[in-house]
Design a protein with these regions (language model features):
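C-terminal beta-sandwich interaction modules and adjacent acidic
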Residues: 1-284
Length: 284
């Protein structure tokens, strides 16, 4: 049996230029190594790792259940130290830069979807456990500018309709892209084809998350437009509205086992009967 080799007394510390980054930006770090032992190092590497937490169905032959698991969506590794030998009192300082890929997924901490990034500095030590220094970082989403319409008009291309025997519904938005911390404005239109009584007319901002076999639906904001109204054949009504997008709203996302989807819904709530609604998918 091979003798037990104790972990060498080597300390790693890092100094990051920032704790949050955008895709395509460099992650610059100063790496400090201090040794109190004589130690051989096979290699020193810097890793940028994006970890996804999701659920999957597992079965023991009798029962099936959801099991939480995790996996790497991204792992970028670069070497900063070639094979070397450390001695007591050895101190090393290395500046290293790694570029985040342009398509890097953002950090997301939702009800279901969870994506996290970390910087992992590793020393590969023969015949014993590697030495790590890990730092959490935040990768921010790249937001898209919201087009501004002249004279308060809504773009015709940002219109979606739905029809049935009762009537026609239409949602018109000022943009199909939302920005966290801002409002999304639009107009909800109803044209009735027959007598229709509803308990309420409202619009909702809805977020749908999915991580493997687990999902969540959240109404993030809601505006009540009308209560207890009856539409007669040929009647037309329209309402302006604004929905608030929270500062902490996660961006639209689809990669690996995870997704975040956003939509605006215009709803005729008929309570005892199936609601009549129209949905407009948006990107955040």
């Amino acid at each position: 049996m091979a003798p037990f080799l104790k972990k060498p007394k080597v300390i790693i510390s890092t100094d990051l230029n920032s704790e949050s980054f955008y895709p395509g930006e460099p992650v610059n770090t100063r790496i400090f190594i201090s040794s109190q032992d004589k130690t051989k190092v096979r290699a020193g590497t810097v890793n940028l790792i994006c970890t996804e937490v999701y659920w999957k169905l597992v079965s023991d032959g009798k029962h099936t259940r959801n099991q939480k698991t995790k996996g790497d969506l991204y792992r970028i590794e670069e070497e900063f130290l070639t094979p070397t030998e450390l001695f007591p009192g050895t101190e090393i300082s290395v500046q290293k830069s790694i570029i985040l890929p342009a398509d890097s997924p953002p950090t997301i901490s939702g009800r279901v979807v969870n994506l996290s990034w970390q910087l992992d500095v590793k020393l590969d030590i023969p015949k014993t456990r590697d030495i790590h220094e890990k730092r959490a970082i935040i990768v921010r989403p790249i937001t898209m500018a919201t087009p501004v319409m002249d004279d308060g008009e809504f773009a015709r291309s940002n219109r979606i309709t739905k029809s049935n025997d009762e009537g026609d519904l239409a949602l018109i938005l000022d943009s199909d892209h939302g920005i966290a911390g801002k409002t999304l404005s639009g107009r909800f239109e109803v044209m009735a084809k027959q007598d229709t009584s509803v308990d309420s007319v409202r619009v909702e901002l809805e977020m749908n998350e999915s991580a493997g076999t687990k999902s969540s639906k959240t109404v993030v904001d809601m505006v009540q437009l009308e209560n207890e109204i009856t539409f007669f054949p040929g009647a037309q009504r329209q309402w302006l509205f604004s929905l608030n997008i929270p500062d902490s709203a996660p961006p639209s996302f689809f990669m690996g086992n995870s997704s975040v989807e956003w939509r605006v819904k215009g709803i005729l709530d008929k309570r005892r009967w199936k609601d009549f609604s129209v949905e407009y998918p948006i990107r955040l």
